[in-house]
A protein has these predicted regions:
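Short, conserved catalytic or adaptor-binding loops enriched in Gly and charged residues
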Residues: 1-4, 45-46, 178-179, 224-226
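Conserved NAD(P)+-binding/catalytic subdomain of aldehyde/semialdehyde dehydrogenases
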Residues: 3-102, 107, 237, 245-262
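NAD(P)-dependent aldehyde/semialdehyde dehydrogenase
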Residues: 92-209, 216-261
């Protein structure tokens, strides 16, 4: 790997507009990975007209669970699903752009099986040991719960727990991407079928994890509805798998110099 080593240089520096300006003006490809505020700031610095630019701003992710198939699971499968969801959401305390904050339950609700999911998620949290909220986390979570309940009319019901807290929504707002708290806090919404979720998919949505749907069902949904958002659709448990296709970009092709010779 000597060739790769010699062709790479990693630079770390404190916030310095002059350095960012110098690098931006000389690069052939610029990748900006950060918050919307960071993206807006760095885009102030001009690049060459031939420079390729890939932008990875704030994103929001959610899960879609088929209640009809969910309620048919065997008891041991609930914990298996909960552990997979735990890895998606809580391994990095919901800070990953692909970690779900919203769960959309699709189909006929079965209260018993629905409660089993949350009971088993609490078990997965206790067994996993990666997600251990401290007192400040708990206070911040409760404070945010009160803020949403007081200010947002979309809130139908709130359930506050030691590890996991939830808010059930009457409807999904257009600014759903600001409905994020972290610390094991999830928003929930119930729909009868896939057609009902089109309006909830904003351009900010990155990853949709799913359980209980056939790949063909989701493929038909995408073809039919052509949602503005969603760049990835993967099974629950695979939200954090990074690949060469990310945020709608083919990273290898977009970051390569391609010469068409015929």
């Amino acid at each position: 790997f000597k060739f790769i080593k010699n062709s790479n240089l990693f630079i770390r520096y404190n916030y310095d507009d002059n350095i960012t300006k110098l690098i931006s003006s000389n690069c052939d490809c610029r990748v900006i990975w950060g918050s919307d505020k960071t993206v807006e700031k760095i885009k102030e610095f001009s690049i060459q007209t031939t420079c390729k630019e890939l932008i990875f701003p704030d994103r929001y992710s959610m899960s879609l669970i088929n209640l009809n198939n969910f309620s048919k699971m065997k008891s041991k499968d609930y914990l298996d699903l909960a552990k997979k969801f735990y890895l998606d959401a809580l391994l990095f305390d919901q800070n990953a752009c692909s970690s779900p904050h919203l769960i959309i339950w699709c189909g006929k609700k079965n209260e018993k099986s629905y409660n089993k999911f949350w009971d088993n998620l609490n078990i997965a949290v206790k067994e996993g040991k990666y997600f251990i909220p401290n007192e400040k986390n708990k206070f911040d979570k409760y404070n945010k719960l009160c803020e949403f309940a007081a200010k947002r009319k979309e809130i139908k019901k709130s359930i506050n727990g030691s590890y996991i807290s939830r808010m059930i929504l009457k409807k999904i707002p257009k600014d759903i991407d600001i409905f994020r708290v972290g610390f094991g806090y999830f928003f929930e919404y119930f729909v009868k079928d896939l057609k009902k979720i089109k309006t909830s998919i904003s351009p900010k949505i990155q990853t949709l994890t799913y359980y209980g749907f056939k790949e063909s069902d989701l493929r038909n949904f995408v073809y039919r509805e052509r949602p503005n958002g969603i760049d990835r659709i993967v099974p629950v448990g695979r939200a954090l798998e990074f690949g060469e296709l990310w945020d709608g970009y083919d990273l290898i092709r977009n970051l390569s110099k391609i010469i068409d010779l015929k």
